[in-house]
Amino acid sequence: MTELNKLTVADSVKGLKNKDFTSKELVNAHIKQIEKYKNLNAYVTETFDLALKQAEEADQNYAQNKARTLEGIPFAVKDLFCTKGIRTTACSNILKNFIPHYESSVTKNIFDKGGVMLGKTNMDEFAMGSTNITSCFGNVISPWKANDDNSDLVPGGSSGGSAAAVSGFMASAALGSDTGGSVRQPASFTGLVGFKPTYGRCSRYGMVSFASSLDQAGIFTRSVLDSSIMLEAMMGFDEKDSTSINAKVPELQSAIGSSMKNMKIGVPLSLGEGGIIEHDIMKMWHDTIELLKNAGAEIVDITLPHAKYGVAVYYVIAPAEAASNLSRYDGVRYGLRVEYENMTLDEMYEMTRSAGFGEEVKRRIMLGTYVLSSNCMDAYYFKAQKVRRLVANDFNNAFTKVNAILLPTAPSAAFKIGEKQNDPTIMYLNDLFTIPASLAGLPCVSVPAGLSARGLPLGMQIIGKQLDEYNVLKVASTIETGVKHIKFEPAGF
């Protein structure tokens, strides 16, 4: 039998229902794996006692035929979802000992369906980063290695801990957040399915904010079916979140394996021009186009003329919102406070924020403050908002002709830790293909679609219309089936 911690969510549910094993056994298998691979630094807070208690309750529910959708399934939580009574830090020194008094809506939804929490995962500080090297707890190491080099690789970011946990079989699934690609890009780097739903599908209540108009909860799984199961549990209207969409949660599992007949897939190949994409990625893109064509889909050439400005727009709007959101961390109400005798209030603010925030967060606060200044607001912030609307209009126009859009998740495979660290602009280009869909608030997924020449996983991204998670999953499932001969599993795990 497959090792328990290697089972998918769907297979775990099936095994628990059939009483092939207990939830406690399933959880203990994951705890053993977490203990074995502590060096990867995927978790920053372990909640094993809670997990075993929840597993016992799950086993009782199975015994009494009262099992819920995710009864007894062990999952991990990115450390920016507030968990009542459990440390939540956003991996920043300024929140290092913060313990919330309330539960985020997304984690509550999963608990209400029977989920078992193994712990909180590492991340880039305040979700700002693409490599998980800005965490105050240290960087995360990917479970993957290249076949020609034993160097440690980045897991992607900002949800790198969640990606490493699921890829390294330390969780069946893991919550992440996606602002400009923070679920999709790590999923591509670690051979996982990473789904970001339509903006507003998942409540932001209890999520530590980065950029409020872009932040959205997402999920890492090892199969497209698992993604559909977790999404059904996570999504739903929440009156505590003013941006929450009051729409019925769709039944998504029937999308898996459904026919591609009459499906039109848009392909913006012009976005790959200019030598920005590695050869392996370009080959995977063309191979996936052929795969979908052979599955019965119609391939349509489209253009997204303003998508190339997405990164520039994002790095005006997101830092501006971050500068506003992070102004609440001042040492007065909660979190870190630096103080000494005869200190003025202004000095306390300055010293606390200087000591509490890391370099990347400071950089983005400075950038955001600058673009919101009276001299620059028209030239940068308002102009960026106008271009954001043009990016959204490009997608709206494309979706009059197609059901979904296909493009790579990232321009490269995972790279060595520290390799691109000294040039923030090169780092920011990691999100070149993920940012446009975030600006438009569209549902999208990264699904493993190939391996590089160095044996590293590569992801394809599928983007759908607003609220059309169903068709996104349908296309992802077709790709998954088409590449099932490839083993997306790190060596030695």
UniProtKB/Swiss-Prot annotation:
SUPFAM superfamilies: Amidase signature (AS) enzymes (SSF75304). The active site is at K78 (charge relay system), S158 (charge relay system), S182 (acyl-ester intermediate). It holds the Pfam family Amidase. This is Glutamyl-tRNA(Gln) amidotransferase subunit A. It comes from Rickettsia typhi (strain ATCC VR-144 / Wilmington). Allows the formation of correctly charged Gln-tRNA(Gln) through the transamidation of misacylated Glu-tRNA(Gln) in organisms which lack glutaminyl-tRNA synthetase. The reaction takes place in the presence of glutamine and ATP through an activated gamma-phospho-Glu-tRNA(Gln). HAMAP family: GatA. Keywords: ATP-binding, Ligase, Nucleotide-binding, Protein biosynthesis. InterPro entries: Amidase, Amidase_CS, Amidase_dom, AS_sf, GatA. It catalyses: L-glutamyl-tRNA(Gln) + L-glutamine + ATP + H2O = L-glutaminyl-tRNA(Gln) + L-glutamate + ADP + phosphate + H(+). Heterotrimer of A, B and C subunits. One of its GO terms (molecular function) is ATP binding. One of its GO terms (biological process) is translation. It is an enzyme of class 6 (ligase).
